[in-house]
Amino acid sequence: MLSRKIVLAVAATFAAMTAMAQCGKITGKIIDNGTREAVIHATVQLLGGDSAFVAGTVTDVNGEFAIEAGGNGKFIVKVSSIGYSVITKTVSVTGGMDVALGTLTMMPDAVMLEGVTATGQAKKVVLKEDTFVYNANAFRTPEGSVVEELVKRLPGAEISDDGKITINGKEVKRIKVDGKEFMTGDTETALKNLPTSIINNIKSYDEKSDMAKMTGIDDGNEETVLDFGIKPGMNKGTMANTDLAVGNHSRYAERLMGGFFNDKVRTMVFGNFNNTNDRGFPGGGGGWRPGNARNGLNTKKMVGVNFNYEEKDRLEIDGHARWNHTNNDTRAEQSAEYFNGGRSSFANSLNQSYSRRDRWVLRMRMEWTPDSMTTLLFRPELSTTTIDKRATGLSASYNSDPFLLYQSPLAPHAIEQMAEEGSIVSTSASNSIFYDNQKYAGATLLASRKLNGEGRNITIEAEASYNKGANEGMSLADTHLYGIINTEGNDSTYQTNRYSTTPTKSYRYSVQATYSEPVFRKTYLQVGYKFAYGHDKSDRSTFDFSKTGGDTFSGLAPAYRGWGQYLARLGNPIGTYLDNDLSRSSDYRSYIHEMQMTFRMVRGKYQMSAGVMLQPQRTRYRQVFKGISVDTVRTVTNFSPTFDLRYNFSKVSRLRISYRGTAAQPAMADLLDITDDSDPMNIRRGNPGLKPAFTHSMRLFYNNYIPRHQRAVMTFAHYSNTRNAVAQTVAYDEKSGARTSRPENVNGNWNANAGVMFNTAIDSTGYFNVNTFTMLGHNNHVGYVAKGRDAASVKNTTRTTNVTERLGLSFRNSWIEVELDGSLNYTHARNLLQEQNNLDTWQFGYGASTTVHMPWGMSVSTDLHEQSRRGYNDRAMNTNELIWNAQISQGFLKNKALTVMLQFHDILHRQSSFTRTLNSMMRSDMRYNSINSYAMLHVTYRLNAFGGGGGRGQFHGNGGRGGHGFGRPGGFGGRRRF
């Protein structure tokens, strides 16, 4: 009897699931009422009878769409696109039958199109809800340039020396092309290889994690995305772009790019080889960016392929494979001041390093939708990385500022003189060799099932990863202590000669389940549970040759993986030099349970969510170091509340306020009461009394767009405060120059920043445009300092205020663009313990740029900017640098497919490479070697065979003659997921 009931229950469940899977599909096509052309990437939403969101999609290149109803009943189809009036259509789905709406026409919105219709001038930026849409045609870039040059010109965008992209105060973590994944995890490849000539627009928005998109639960893992939209007509067919360049000072740059596109498949292949530090094109505007240093001489090589496949509403496959190689030659001069209680200590160093890096990466994403209620997502990844490095260095520490006496404090005569005066503490000469090899494999599997059309769903996610590494290193140092006398009455000297090997292993896995239940109308309760396990193992063996004699390794120069030449000079087998006190093995395991609950409301004007996460955590740490074996277990519970409110004033105006509290536990190694003096000049101690830290973080974001005046406004603010933050107490030994650090909990660490972006046309015709980006930041950094290893610690607070401003005024018509621009970065730092260390530094620049297009296909771009620094300790760094760049290009053949360009970088030989860092413990100024002044001759050839006419004759740099807005209305590129 019981078995019969079970069979009936299973049959009923199967029947219900089958019925749910029989969902009607609604199809249609959207066209422009005037041109009768397809409206591409229009937003199509399916709403229930109560206007609740059911499903969404965007139209394809033919203006067509298909959307699953998810059940029977009456629905509203809502179609919207920037530049058009919204259209709605009521439909009924019965018996799971498909519904064909046929062709729907969209009428242009007279208000939104007023600026473009009247003048034909391109709007620079349009805002729609949470998305910034930048018109690529409104930002002229030099012929043959890549999208990095385009991003530099976007209002509110910055690209740092290390390639980090920041836009509107947020770091860009992902690049997409037409809404599809592109080289995930590698923003540099897109910036350095995608040509601007194929880009129609750039979207900037925050994208939730895969888990959050499927469940609706905000897990705090949003990523800021730059989404490059391809020009209409260029998304079907084949294209190729070749750029070959040579220059003086042995500079070269070769870039190859090919693409194949059709309705289902998109394949792009890239190759890039250069020794110009991947430096962009000169001229064409954009102004100066503070801190635009060139850190060393870099040779970079890259080969990659990106693949996208889409079977509409059924299957998506995204993947990429790439090889990156980097050779680096860096000469770094550092000048540092350390805040030690009542007075400062100073240090200077000169280091020459060479490194090479090879990295292979394979990443894929597969999303399968067997029916409208079920989604499966799989993300595998494989990578291998090898790094080689060799370096030599010279450093010295002082008890007074050496620049007050000598322009070159590391010069032999300066060191000798300061030794007689007693102002120098120590010197050290070193060389080192390092090798590291890492292999990684990981995968994520995510499955989501809608249980009805009202918002009830369940999602399961599983992750696993494995990493195996091995590194070897050889380091030699010869240290001279001027304040310590040996038994013979001379200055104390000692050598530190060591070789180490460190194999490592780590693996992790986690399982997570979330469930969403509609509790009221458009109101949902979501709960989730996650278990995560992690295991990290390291076993460092250190061999000490410090007592073998000062001449054992004389005459040897560091070479990649060249420790064999050093080990060959040892008089005994290497095993006899093993130092158990310097060797260390560790085993770290973590067991984390995570429970979360989120309450979410969705209304016509706003969305609100509030939640809480509890995280019981058990960790076990085992270590053998200095002959001491430690086995410790820690059990803690972390707590994290969240709140998020999004209010839509209109389609182009939104306010967002969010809060998140996060708890963080001290590192287990910091909790061990062990002194690590393996580096005698930098000694570390543990602190078993450390408490967990808790950070409050609040954000505000507002944007608005006024189409009539082509005016965009954006403002943001962020505040963060950490209780029981971990800071390092640093004790300075005036005799030896050694520093002993110990972690301590501090309160008072907080930071805040706010920014405003404003972009508007000045005249009614849109020829004149002004844009400004202003940012104000303040950081309150607390630390402890002490003079002497056993001296009492003194609390030190450094308060730093930064003001950044970028202002540009431009004029543009069909053949010329002129821009006047200025930039300012002011730092106001106050040290409460030592007022003499208060700093006020300025970096500012101003100048002009212009681009002219001649009727016969010639283009000339140039810019002239004065860059200045003030307030730096080293007087040699308070400079004025007049930077002049220029480029001239001429197009040949049909549609200017062949272009010859001559570029001149830093014609006046005035640019330098300099950076500064500042916190409560120290300030540090760095200067690097670089080749900033050179000329390059480029030959570029473009071949394209596109299926649509839109791509032909338009394969030129952005903003070429006749650039018009965003193409036809509605052509805003990338696909957005719902």
Predicted regions and their residues:
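Beta-strand-rich domain onsets/edges
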Residues: 15-25, 31
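Periplasmic plug
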Residues: 127, 164-212, 225-232, 265
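Short, acidic Ser/Thr/Gly-rich low-complexity loop/linker segments typical of extracellular
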Residues: 49-64
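Short Pro-Gly-centered beta-turn/loop motif in secreted/extracellular proteins
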Residues: 39-40, 66-74
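Structural motif
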Residues: 29-39
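Primarily recognizes Gram-negative and organellar outer-membrane beta-barrels
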Residues: 185-187, 208-250, 264-978
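Short, polar/charged loop or turn motifs at beta-strand boundaries
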Residues: 30, 131-154, 166-167, 177-182, ...
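Short, acidic, small-residue-rich periplasmic hinge/interaction motif at the N-terminus
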Residues: 31, 45-47, 78-84, 94, ...
